[in-house]
Swiss-Prot record:
Transmembrane segments: none annotated. This carinactivase-like calcium-dependent prothrombin (F2) activator activates prothrombin via recognition of the calcium ion bound conformation of its gamma-carboxyglutamic acid (GLA) domain, and the subsequent conversion of prothrombin to active thrombin is catalyzed by the catalytic subunit. Its EC number is 3.4.24.-. This is Zinc metalloproteinase multactivase catalytic subunit. It is found in: Secreted. It comes from Echis multisquamatus. The lineage of its organism: Eukaryota, Metazoa, Chordata, Craniata, Vertebrata. Keywords: Blood coagulation cascade activating toxin, Calcium, Disulfide bond, Hemostasis impairing toxin, Hydrolase, Metal-binding, Metalloprotease, Protease, Prothrombin activator, Secreted, Toxin, Zinc. The keyword Amino-acid biosynthesis does not apply. Residues 12-27 form the Peptidase M12B domain.
């Protein structure tokens, strides 16, 4: 993947983790 794609994926994963920890509203 291009570097910017990797950064996006990392930030997206971090966001999912944060939302998941806030009572799973993402799911």
């Amino acid at each position: 993947f291009p570097p910017h794609k990797g950064k996006f994926d990392k930030k997206f994963i971090e966001l999912v983790i944060i939302v998941d920890h806030s009572x799973x509203t993402y799911k």
